[in-house]
A protein has these predicted regions:
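Thiol/disulfide oxidoreductase modules built on the thioredoxin-like
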Residues: 47-53
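Residue-level recognition of specific faces of alpha-helices
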Residues: 3, 14, 56, 66-69
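Methionine-biased hydrophobic packing positions in alpha-helices, especially
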Residues: 6, 45-46
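Chalcogenol-based redox active-site neighborhoods
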Residues: 20, 47, 80
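Local sequence-structure signature of Cys/Sec-based thiol-disulfide redox active-site neighborhoods
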Residues: 1-29
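Thiol-based oxidoreductase modules, predominantly thioredoxin-like and allied folds used
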Residues: 28-42
Length: 85
C-alpha cells in the first residue's frame, strides 16, 4: 500500500471523516501534517496542491484532493486500485 499523506487541522470535521473513511478501506497509517501547528506548513501545502482548504490527501505521489474528491474517486471505482498500487 502506498504512503498516505494528509494535510489537516485540529478542528476540521472533513479531516476526521477522511481519516475514518481511509481506515475503513484498510489504511492503517496516515502521515498527518498539521497546518495549524507547523509554521509554513499551510504555505507548503498551497504550493504543492494549489488549494487552501484541508484536508488535502495524497496517496503515494497522487494528489487526490479533499474529502469530497476522495469520496468521488471511490464512487468512480478509482480508490481501491490507487490504494493497491
Amino acid at each position: 500500500m502506498p504512503a498516505i499523506t494528509m494535510y489537516t487541522t485540529a478542528v476540521c470535521p472533513y479531516c476526521v471523516r477522511a481519516k475514518q473513511f481511509l481506515k475503513s478501506r484498510g489504511v492503517d497509517h496516515i502521515e498527518e501534517i498539521r497546518v495549524d501547528l507547523h509554521p509554513g506548513a499551510r504555505e507548503a501545502m498551497m504550493e504543492r496542491t494549489g488549494r487552501r482548504t484541508v484536508p488535502q490527501i495524497y496517496i503515494g505521489d497522487t494528489h487526490v484532493g479533499g474529502f469530497d474528491d476522495l469520496s468521488a474517486l471511490d464512487r468512480a471505482g478509482g480508490l481501491d486500485p490507487l490504494l493497491q498500487s
